[in-house]
Amino acid sequence: MIDREINPYVDEWEKEGQFPAHALFKKMGDAGLLGVDKPVAFGGSGLDFSYAMICSESLGLVNGGSVPMGTGVQISMATPALARYGSDELRREFLAPSITGDYVACLGVSETGAGSDVASIKTTARSDGDDYVINGGKMWITNGTQADWMCLLANTGEGPVHRNKSLICLPMKTKGVEVLRKLDKLGMHCSDTAEIKFTDVRVPKRNRIGEEGKGFTYQMLQFQEERLWAVAACLKSHEKTIDETIDYTRARKAFGKPLLDNQVIHFRLAELKTEVELLRSLLYRACEEYINGNDVTPLATMGKLKAGRLGREIPDACLQYWGGMGFMNETRVSRAYRDRRLTSIGGGADEVMLSVLCKYMGTLPEQ
């Protein structure tokens, strides 16, 4: 599918500023890729989480990070809590068509003043009879301009910030939902990213996922799958960047010999290849622990942190060896340089990952 339905069109989609999510997700849905780890009763394959990781790792062969990221939202970011905690009615209405690719999903968590600090979100869903009335806004929403529904995190109460939030399935065509703008980004050019505003948006309370006030907890669980997806999606991409750099530096001659013959280059590429393989081993261990029902927060956090670091280190080192050609948009290494920078920011910044790890290690200073 990647060679036939995606890679031939990526350059065109990059220029257009988005990939056709509905058309592509429908093809993925027909192939059974969007619900590999989701319940059979709602159109999924009922397999374990490792199969979602196989999908993610395979998508690393796409010529850019946009399609893997948008697909990751559909599989491992906007739907895990719905699949696990949603009512059968909600799962029929939102999960089933997301698995078939008839619906495009997005995740509404981040806000202008609350990115990694999820507890500080300001969007509210006020109780009004059998409905919630939603006001506020969300920022940096992947798939936001094309989505049919949003898995929205909003404040539904006045209590402590970790116990006053709920996840709500919000149809994007509901009155009062407004896409303010499509955001212009450094990288991930064919992944549409939106700023979205909510003005007196009314949705029935039956659209809430699970219990009221449990949204923060549910979202933290979704973050684990999101972070593991991000790790898996970068592996083959990094390997491809390294392999293409080997090919280029072997063919490119300077001062009478191939660039690759310089020890500083072939040693560095060997180091980077080792780093990728070590990250893969960490991912596979975390995946096994997750399947066995264990808390993978430390392992997923370590993986996300390392993936973010390598997302800067590998494209930067490889681009340097491409020299002037690496600075040209026509080379894939320049796209990797732009796209992979996001891994250190999205889904929890590196600094937040370090804080999480320090908390588990008992080294975080008391507040």
Language-model segments: residues:
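Alpha-helical interface subdomain recognition
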Residues: 1-62, 72, 85-90, 97-102, ...
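A short, Trp-centered hydrophobic/proline-enriched beta-strand micro-motif
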Residues: 101-109, 153
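Short Gly/Pro-enriched turn/cap motifs at secondary-structure boundaries
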Residues: 72, 98, 113-116, 140-143, ...
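Helix-loop "lid/cap" segments that line or gate small-molecule binding pockets
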Residues: 76-85
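Short beta-strand-to-turn element immediately C-terminal to the catalytic PLP-Schiff-base lysine
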Residues: 84-86, 126, 152-156, 169-171, ...
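A short core secondary-structure module
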Residues: 131, 135-179
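Short Ser/Thr-interspersed hydrophobic loop/turn segments at strand-loop and sheet-helix junctions
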Residues: 32, 55-60, 154, 170-175, ...
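Flexible, small-/acidic-enriched active-site or ligand-binding loops
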Residues: 120, 173-204
